Amino acid sequence: MSAIAQNPWLMVLAIFIINVCYVTFLTMRTILTLKGYRYVAAVVSFMEVLVYVVGLGLVMSSLDQIQNIFAYALGFSVGIIVGMKIEEKLALGYTVVNVTSSEYELDLPNELRNLGYGVTHYEAFGRDGSRMVMQILTPRKYELKLMDTVKNLDPKAFIIAYEPRNIHGGFWVKGVRKRKLKAYEPEQLEVVVDHEEIVGGSSNEQKV
């Protein structure tokens, strides 16, 4: 600690790193608490307080220089970004994506089920007539992949995504096949759909 205190640039670096770590844990703990992951949030809060006790005393006793104040503020802002990025990478929980489409002939519900998603669909009516509405459950890490998939199948589809607070009952979570979701790529979707159509067509011909 004495070596750091004697070198102003080491002090700036120490203040920046300590505050990045502290605010990263603080941001993650806040997000996890809001999402209901209480036990994970408790572990993160332990790390947060540990950094606070060990390092923040050094930081707060060295804010008499302008460069230290700047390092403290910069570390705070970077810590928020880092904490949010880590939480995004962890992608805990599920996302519900609502899709409204007028293209009944595409059979989007079954196409998405074949790709591994849990889908509930029903008919609705808008200004321009009948529409098909789908509620699609997906792990958060595959949310963008699902949206790209829907856009490839129906570029005119109306899409809304939100994160459910709690999930209980039904077959949604069991209906999500994570291995299937991981196996395909949206840009290869046309090949997958064509293959399904070929297989379905050949089986129908054999039955006839």
From Swiss-Prot:
HAMAP family: UPF0316 (MF_01515). Keywords: Cell membrane, Membrane, Transmembrane, Transmembrane helix. The chain crosses the membrane at residues 8-28, 40-60, 66-86. GO terms for cellular component: plasma membrane. This is UPF0316 protein SERP1448. The keyword Ubl conjugation does not apply. It is found in: Cell membrane. The keyword Metal-binding does not apply. Pfam families: DUF2179, DUF5698. Its main location: membrane. Belongs to the UPF0316 family. It is a multi-pass membrane protein. It comes from Staphylococcus epidermidis (strain ATCC 35984 / DSM 28319 / BCRC 17069 / CCUG 31568 / BM 3577 / RP62A).
